[in-house]
UniProtKB/Swiss-Prot annotation:
Keywords: Gas vesicle. Disruption phenotype: Required to make gas vesicles in E.coli in the absence of GVP 1. Disulfide bonds: none annotated. GO terms for cellular component: gas vesicle shell; vesicle membrane. This is Gas vesicle protein A2. The minimal pNL29 gvp locus overexpressed in E.coli can be filled with Xe and used as a contrast agent for ultrasound and magnetic resonance imaging. Pfam families: Gas_vesicle. InterPro entries: Gas-vesicle_GvpA-like (IPR000638), Gas_vesicle_GvpA (IPR047870), GvpA (IPR050530), GvpA-like_CS (IPR018493).
Length: 88
């Protein structure tokens, strides 16, 4: 088995296109302690992908709700006109 070295260089546009096409996940965890006392903890998960890539992934693992796909989004009610509604 031999190692092949690519002599082609990639432009920034090609790298970004590849990342958006395949997606990338960066999972980071850092903890700063002094004398056993935790001062700072950082947890981060960054996902970079195109909307098309996420939709293909969500459909493959069943994250998309069937009722939204079949019936569309539900109608908005006007019970609280002028008041923004947020739900989590």
């Amino acid at each position: 088995m031999s190692i092949q070295k690519s002599t082609n260089s990639s432009s920034l546009a090609e790298v970004i296109d590849r990342i958006l096409d395949k997606g990338i996940v960066i999972d980071a965890f850092a903890r700063v302690s002094v004398v056993g006392i935790e001062i700072l903890t950082i947890e981060a998960r960054v996902v970079i992908a195109s909307v098309d890539t996420w939709l293909r992934y969500a459909e493959a693992v069943g994250l998309l709700r069937d009722d939204v796909e079949e019936n569309g989004l539900p109608e908005r009610s006007n019970s609280s006109e002028g008041q923004p509604r947020f739900s989590i």
